[in-house]
């Protein structure tokens, strides 16, 4: 039989346990990333900056180096309503169109045959709902065309006299052929795992440990320890490309913001000749090697894919397609892209 004092003690302990459980739950919720690539491309409320780590705030820690979105406030463009599941990428890219766009990806001569599936593309896109879900229908289609245009160049198996033309052979490769190195650079934040190599893999030919690390963290996979997943798991492969597409890096906007009209050039951008359009995306992806020195066959190839895909969607390409006269964002390649 318990005494009143014992009963009071038990009640106090029960209350303390309840408070501890509540505190743990609140702490877990507080740790969940709020925005950016870590949260499926979400933007912060009330025009807050999204830090490189996926948190919302207003100080330089959030709005400074690595800021992912709304780094100078929302600007004049309103944040779009997130698409409902019924308005996902599949609603503008039905299976038959996907097959026509990537016509020869499963050709017997393509090393990636059978890898890049429609199902994997949709599954990866669902993790980034703003991709192909921002703006009106034409803008949504143009973003998919631009994404497939850039990634088709990175994975092309085409040649000038190829059947159905050179721009029907995107997604022929899934990893770099004969990589010259292990693409490991010393990094305390993204250390290379023993024996692992970070050469180009996937639609964007993701390269270097400093890209595999943050890409893996954003999609919930340890790619520093398992870089081969980008060439063996098609959904992971597409997700890494979409992570790169959706994520601003350094002084570069995201490709997503450029093609959807959410990016406005700064005075420095204008002075560098960087104007809104597909050409800036090429600059983001590989400007250090391809932009700013006049006509370049690689840039023309990227444009060729994009024009074909826009034609298949029945939309215009917009202006400023090349980066021939744009100063690069960096002095070198942003991804360490592989030339097939």
Swiss-Prot record:
GO terms for biological process: cell wall macromolecule catabolic process; chitin catabolic process; defense response to fungus; polysaccharide catabolic process. Keywords: Carbohydrate metabolism, Chitin degradation, Chitin-binding, Disulfide bond, Glycosidase, Hydrolase, Plant defense, Polysaccharide degradation, Signal. Disulfide bonds join 35-50, 44-56, 47-74, 49-63, 67-71, 110-172, 184-192, 291-323. Its EC number is 3.2.1.14. It is an enzyme of class 3 (hydrolase). It catalyses: Random endo-hydrolysis of N-acetyl-beta-D-glucosaminide (1->4)-beta-linkages in chitin and chitodextrins. Residues 1-32 form the signal peptide. Expressed in roots, sheaths and meristems. One of its GO terms (molecular function) is chitin binding. Pfam families: Chitin_bind_1 (PF00187), Glyco_hydro_19 (PF00182). The active site is at 154 (proton donor). Residues 33-73 form the Chitin-binding type-1 domain. The keyword Disulfide bond applies. Hydrolyzes chitin and plays a role in defense against fungal pathogens containing chitin. Its overexpression confers enhanced resistance to sheath blight pathogen (R.solani). Belongs to the glycosyl hydrolase 19 family. Chitinase class I subfamily. PANTHER family: CHITINASE 2, CHITINASE-RELATED. This is Chitinase 2. It comes from Oryza sativa subsp. japonica.
